[in-house]
Design a protein with these regions (language model features):
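Short beta-strand to alpha-helix junction loop
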Residues: 69-88, 254-262, 288-299
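Short, conserved catalytic or adaptor-binding loops enriched in Gly and charged residues
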Residues: 92-94, 148-152, 301-305
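Feature captures the FAD/FMN-dependent oxidoreductase FAD-binding
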Residues: 74-140
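Tryptophan-centric aromatic hotspots in well-structured domains and transmembrane helices
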Residues: 16, 45-47, 72, 106-120, ...
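Beta1-alpha1 glycine-rich phosphate/pyrophosphate-binding loop at the start
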Residues: 11, 16-99, 202, 273-278
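Alpha/beta-hydrolase fold catalytic core
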Residues: 260-306
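Rossmann-like dinucleotide-binding core of oxidoreductases
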Residues: 3-5, 14-16, 20-40, 134-272
C-alpha cells in the first residue's frame, strides 16, 4: 500500500451501504477504512427508534444477497431486527476493526498531482485514500419545522429520527406533524396509549394494504435447513419490488393504466378502513399514485376512526 495513504479505499458511513461496501472490499483484497460520525454502526436503524419502526420493503429483499437471514420474525422486519442484523454481518465477515467512530467528515478534495483524496474531519483529523465511497445516506440530519414560537413550547419536542425513549406518552396530549412514511408507522403505534392525538397533515399519502405477517418458527427452520427456499422467495419479492418501484413510481407517467389500478386499490382500501365520509375525503390524495412516495399500512387509516 502507498505509504502516503491511510487506506486504498475510505468509506464514509456505516449503515447498510457502508457495511456492504466494506464486506465486498475485504473480499476483493482492498485495504479500507469506514469512517462513522456516531459511536456505533447501523445507520438509519441506529438513529431511528420510534414506536412502530419497520422496513417497508420485505425483509427477504432488504438484506444482503450473500447473507440471507433465515430468522426474520416478520415479512417486514422491525427496526431492532435490522439493527441486530447489521451487527451480525459486521461480526461474521470480520470487518469490525475497519471502523473509526466519532469522525464527522467535513470536506474532501482530490489532489490531482498525487492522485489522492484528502478527507478532513470537523475535529481536524485527516485521512488519505485513493478512492472514496460515500455511504452517508440521504436523510441523516433531522430538522424541526420552523414554527414561530416553537422555542417557547412548554411541552416535550421529539423528532422521530432522534426518539427520546425516556418520555412516557401515556395519557398525554400528542401532536404529530406530517403524514409521510414515518407518520404512517408512528401514529397507529402511539394512538392507543395517548390521551388525545392530533395529526397535522399538509398532503395525504396513498396507502396500500401491507402484506405483513409473522414468520412461523417452522418456516424459519425450513429456511435454515434448505436455504434455496428462502432464495426462491427473495427472487419473487425482488421482482415484485422492482416492478412496483420502476413502473408505478419511477415511470408512473408511462403506465397510466397501472397507476389507475393502484389508485383504485388504495381508494377501496380507504373505504374499508375509514368510516366517516369527510375523514375519507381528507385522507384522499389529490395527486396521482407514484407522484409522491406511497406507503404500506394495515392500521394507519383505521386510526382516524377514533
Amino acid at each position: 500500500m502507498n505509504s502516503k495513504i491511510d487506506a486504498e479505499v475510505i468509506v464514509i458511513g456505516s449503515g447498510f451501504a457502508g457495511i456492504g461496501a466494506g464486506i465486498e472490499l475485504k473480499n476483493a483484497g482492498f485495504s479500507f477504512l469506514i469512517l462513522e460520525r456516531a459511536t456505533e454502526i447501523g445507520g438509519t436503524w441506529r438513529d431511528n427508534q420510534y414506536p412502530g419502526i419497520a422496513v417497508d420493503i420485505t425483509s427477504f429483499t432488504y438484506s444482503y444477497s450473500f447473507e440471507q437471514n433465515p430468522k426474520w420474525n416478520h415479512v417486514f422486519a422491525k427496526g431492532k431486527e435490522l439493527f441486530l442484523y447489521a451487527h451480525h454481518c459486521v461480526e461474521k465477515y470480520g470487518i469490525s476493526n475497519n471502523f473509526i467512530f466519532g469522525v464527522d467528515v467535513e470536506k474532501a478534495y482530490f489532489d490531482e498531482n498525487q492522485a489522492i483524496w484528502n478527507i478532513q474531519a470537523k475535529d481536524g483529523r485527516q485521512f488519505k485514500s485513493n478512492i472514496i465511497i460515500s455511504a452517508t445516506g440521504a436523510l441523516t440530519d433531522p430538522k424541526f419545522p420552523e414554527i414561530k414560537g416553537i422555542e417557547n413550547f412548554k411541552g416535550d419536542l421529539i423528532h422521530t429520527a432522534r426518539w427520546n425513549n425516556t418520555i412516557d406518552l401515556k395519557n398525554k396530549r400528542v401532536a404529530v406533524i406530517g403524514t409521510g412514511a414515518t407518520s404512517v408507522q408512528l401514529v397507529p403505534s402511539i394512538a392507543p396509549e395517548v390521551k388525545h392525538l392530533s395529526v397535522f397533515q399538509r398532503t395525504p399519502i396513498w396507502i396500500l394494504p401491507k402484506p405483513d405477517t409473522a414468520i412461523p418458527k417452522s418456516v424459519q427452520s425450513l429456511f435454515s435447513r434448505i436455504p434455496f427456499t428462502q432464495q426462491a422467495i427473495r427472487v419473487i419479492t425482488d421482482k415484485i419490488t422492482e416492478t412496483v418501484m420502476v413502473t408505478s413510481v419511477v415511470h408512473y407517467k408511462q403506465v397510466p393504466f397501472l397507476v389507475k389500478a393502484f389508485e383504485q386499490l388504495c381508494l377501496n382500501f380507504l373505504r374499508l378502513q375509514v368510516n366517516k365520509k369527510t375523514t375519507r375525503e381528507a385522507l384522499t390524495p389529490k395527486y396521482g399514485f407514484g407522484c409522491k412516495r406511497p406507503s404500506f399500512s394495515n392500521n394507519y387509516l383505521a386510526t382516524f376512526n377514533r
